[in-house]
């Protein structure tokens, strides 16, 4: 799991790549998002274009991060989901929890709305 961070228009974008699985990526994602929230960043976008696999622990990390962000007055959104991740979110009904976007520009604009 590799996480690259960049800021565009006041939104922290985490470009994730690799696997988000138990012991490999799940804690990294949660810790990075917790750090952003602790630093006062409330608008977080996860770019999942390069995530090739996610297991139940990875899903748990996304849900936990979403809940933590919401509790702290922030928002966490997802962009560039692969077909596999879209299907997984649909099967688990989590697609109704997360705001998801196909394009980064659209996702960034949603934070201003």
Stretch-by-stretch model annotation:
Residues 2-4, 34-35, 109:
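Short, flexible, glycine/charge-rich loop motifs used to bind or transfer phosphoryl groups or to couple energy/partner
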Residues 106-112:
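Short, charged, intrinsically disordered terminal tails
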Residues 83, 105-106:
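Acidic phosphotransfer microenvironment of two-component signaling modules
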Residues 20-98:
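Amphipathic alpha-helical interaction surfaces in cytosolic regulatory modules
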Residues 99-103:
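Short acidic-hydrophobic, aromatic-tinged amphipathic segments that line or gate anion-handling sites
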Residues 1-15:
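Short beta-strand/loop segment at the start of cytosolic alpha/beta domains
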């Amino acid at each position: 799991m590799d996480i690259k961070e960049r800021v565009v228009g006041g939104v922290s974008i985490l470009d994730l790549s690799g696997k988000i699985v138990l012991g490999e990526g799940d804690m990294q994602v949660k810790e990075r998002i917790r750090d952003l929230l602790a630093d006062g960043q409330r608008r977080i976008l996860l770019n999942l274009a390069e995530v090739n696999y996610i297991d139940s622990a990875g899903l748990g990390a996304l849900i936990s991060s979403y809940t933590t962000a919401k509790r702290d007055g922030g928002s966490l959104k997802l962009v560039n989901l692969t077909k596999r991740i879209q299907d997984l979110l649909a099967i688990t009904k989590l697609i109704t929890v997360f705001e998801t976007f196909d394009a980064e520009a659209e996702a960034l604009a949603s934070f201003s709305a």
